[in-house]
């Protein structure tokens, strides 16, 4: 496995293979990664899950306890599970896949994060040729 460098990530952004609800800030692009950002679509849910062959929109309907407004100063409750759509979306080519891991800041703040995809079979793994949203 090899990693994309900053210039390769920029090329994917320029070509629309990585795109966002908001413009991608140049500071999000790191030497060998892209910092992902939360959208305003966030839900407190009953349990964590791996999508497998289930649409995430259906899981939201089944597991959602409440919608969380991230447009205001919001305090996320301790020991609760939240599902947030990320601003960034992907149209990966067949020869590129992705791996995600939290920034060290989230660990220092005692926040546990995972990334999931539609029909994903494991946390923090984005399959080759994936097209869709990230959560």
What kind of feature is each model-predicted range?
Residues 1-135:
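Non-catalytic terminal segments and appended small domains
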């Amino acid at each position: 496995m090899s990693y994309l460098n900053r210039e390769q990530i920029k090329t994917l952004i320029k070509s629309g293979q990585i795109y966002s609800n908001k413009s991608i800030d140049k500071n999000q692009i790191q030497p060998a990664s892209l910092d992902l950002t939360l959208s305003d679509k966030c839900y407190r849910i009953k349990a964590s899950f791996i999508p497998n062959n289930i649409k995430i929109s259906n899981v939201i309907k089944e597991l959602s306890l409440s919608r969380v407004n991230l447009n205001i100063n919001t305090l996320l409750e301790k020991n609760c599970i939240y599902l947030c759509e990320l601003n960034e979306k992907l149209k990966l080519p067949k020869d590129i896949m992705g791996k995600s891991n939290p920034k060290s800041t989230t660990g220092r703040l005692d926040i546990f994060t995972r990334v999931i995809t539609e029909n994903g079979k494991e946390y923090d793994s984005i399959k080759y040729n994936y097209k869709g949203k990230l959560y």
